[in-house]
């Protein structure tokens, strides 16, 4: 299975909602195919401790494991990849240091998309499609903006930002390779059930 096929159901951790390890285990059981560890305020030691546990879980479920922003942590826990924003380490530098990692890059507009492609990213995280409480500084792109980028991008696109069970089908109709979700899964009362339901919706569009 190519890595692109595993981008379809991409879950990002958030300890404000639930413990990373237990929420990821339930999400994987419910069908998540990629996991991203995002721990912006934690110590490096804590990130590595949690990352090692998530690496074990994702391997058991044959899912991809990404670390947000931190190349050192991604390497320490033997992650499959890293996801970076426009202000983080340049994609080209990551490729020099860790050529085997899958690199995702955030893009809020066509210029940022082109920069990510030029620098050698492997996939794009495009959004925010809808307003979101998990990333308050995110710029809203909307469905039209997502469609515009989808039409011209040469890389797989993972849509992100405010995606939930009621709007995910509208997002998938834009021709993306996957959707990234935070609160709709890890913030759910029943994470397993929410993941299963989301997986069923995604499968209608991406086999």
Curated annotation (Swiss-Prot):
Residue ranges crossing the lipid bilayer per the database entry? none
Catalytic reactions of this protein:
2-[(2R,5Z)-2-carboxy-4-methylthiazol-5(2H)-ylidene]ethyl phosphate + 4-amino-2-methyl-5-(diphosphooxymethyl)pyrimidine + 2 H(+) = thiamine phosphate + CO2 + diphosphate; 2-(2-carboxy-4-methylthiazol-5-yl)ethyl phosphate + 4-amino-2-methyl-5-(diphosphooxymethyl)pyrimidine + 2 H(+) = thiamine phosphate + CO2 + diphosphate; 4-methyl-5-(2-phosphooxyethyl)-thiazole + 4-amino-2-methyl-5-(diphosphooxymethyl)pyrimidine + H(+) = thiamine phosphate + diphosphate
Q: Where does Mg(2+) bind?
A: 69, 88
Note describing how the cofactor binds: Binds 1 Mg(2+) ion per subunit.
Q: Which enzyme type, at the first EC level?
A: transferase
Q: Which residues bind 2-[(2R,5Z)-2-carboxy-4-methylthiazol-5(2H)-ylidene]ethyl phosphate?
A: 132-134, 162, 182-183
* GO CC terms, sorted: cytoplasm
Keyword annotations: Magnesium, Metal-binding, Thiamine biosynthesis, Transferase
Q: Where does 4-amino-2-methyl-5-(diphosphooxymethyl)pyrimidine bind?
A: 36-40, 68, 106, 135
Q: Is-annotated flag, keyword Cell wall biogenesis/degradation?
A: no
Q: Which GO terms describe its molecular function?
A: magnesium ion binding; thiamine-phosphate diphosphorylase activity
**Cofactors (names):** Mg(2+)
Any single biological process term in GO: thiamine diphosphate biosynthetic process
* Enzyme Commission number(s) of this protein: 2.5.1.3
Pathway involvement? Answer: Cofactor biosynthesis; thiamine diphosphate biosynthesis; thiamine phosphate from 4-amino-2-methyl-5-diphosphomethylpyrimidine and 4-methyl-5-(2-phosphoethyl)-thiazole: step 1/1
General function of this protein: Condenses 4-methyl-5-(beta-hydroxyethyl)thiazole monophosphate (THZ-P) and 2-methyl-4-amino-5-hydroxymethyl pyrimidine pyrophosphate (HMP-PP) to form thiamine monophosphate (TMP).
NCBIfam families named among the record's database cross-references: thiE
Which HAMAP family does the UniProt entry name for this protein? Answer: TMP_synthase
- Name the protein family: Belongs to the thiamine-phosphate synthase family.
Q: What is this protein called?
A: Thiamine-phosphate synthase
Q: Which species expresses this protein natively?
A: Methanococcus maripaludis (strain C5 / ATCC BAA-1333)
What is the name of the gene encoding this protein? Answer: thiE
């Amino acid at each position: 299975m190519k890595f692109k096929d595993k981008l379809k159901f991409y879950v990002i951790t958030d300890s404000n909602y639930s413990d990373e390890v237990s929420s990821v285990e339930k999400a994987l059981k419910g069908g998540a195919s990629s996991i991203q560890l995002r721990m912006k305020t934690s110590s490096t030691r804590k990130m590595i401790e949690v990352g090692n546990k998530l690496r074990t879980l994702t391997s058991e479920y044959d899912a991809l494991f990404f670390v947000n922003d931190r190349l050192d942590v991604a390497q320490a826990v033997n992650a499959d990849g890293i996801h970076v924003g426009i202000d983080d380490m340049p994609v080209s530098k990551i490729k020099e240091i860790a050529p085997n990692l899958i690199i995702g890059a955030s893009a809020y507009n066509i210029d940022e998309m082109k920069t990510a492609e030029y620098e050698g990213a492997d996939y794009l995280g495009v959004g925010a499609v809808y307003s979101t409480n998990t990333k308050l500084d995110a710029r809203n792109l909307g469905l039209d903006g997502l469609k515009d980028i989808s039409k011209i991008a040469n890389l797989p696109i993972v849509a992100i930002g405010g995606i939930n069970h009621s709007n995910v089908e509208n997002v998938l109709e834009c021709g993306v390779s996957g959707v990234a979700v935070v609160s709709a899964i890890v913030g759910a009362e029943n994470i397993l059930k929410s993941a299963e339901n989301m997986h069923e919706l995604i499968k209608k569009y991406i086999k």
